[in-house]
Amino acid sequence: MKVLYGTPEFMAPEVVSFEPVSFSTDMWSVGVICYILLSGESPFQGDTDMETLSNVTAARWDFEEETFSEISQQAKDFISQLLQKDPRRRLPSAGALLHPWLQHSQPSSSKVLSKERIRQFLARRKWQKTGKALLALKRLT
């Protein structure tokens, strides 16, 4: 199946490229969600949807030192295995459930996730949606 539907920063590269989608497409989105939950930032979000889609297509992302310095190596490995550009190289759902990061019963860090970063992330998305709505209205008039 081929589709182009979704929120740009959560789309897998194969969706942007109109290539067939599969379960591994959803695993990409799980990687994006984990990145956001741990950092309060999107790995691919640009200033515009086109910039975001370009970042996704190139699989251009990294673990910023300031944000991820206290995040475990296992968590970063989990995300890295999910954000593979090639869907065949992505961690499948069964492998994800067996990943050491999810198998650990005790958190290895006492770091508190930044509520402010999450708020900023959500506020930015809200403004971008408002801008898109205004552009759509402008096209109708």
What are these regions (language model features)?
Residues 94-141:
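C-terminal regulatory tails of eukaryotic serine/threonine kinases
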Residues 2-11:
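Conserved activation segment of eukaryotic-like protein kinases, specifically the C-terminal portion
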Residues 15-24:
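Conserved end of the kinase activation segment
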Residues 70-82:
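Conserved C-terminal C-lobe helix
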Residues 83-95:
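A conserved short helix/loop substructure at the end of the activation segment
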Residues 39-42:
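Structural helix C-cap motif within protein kinase domains
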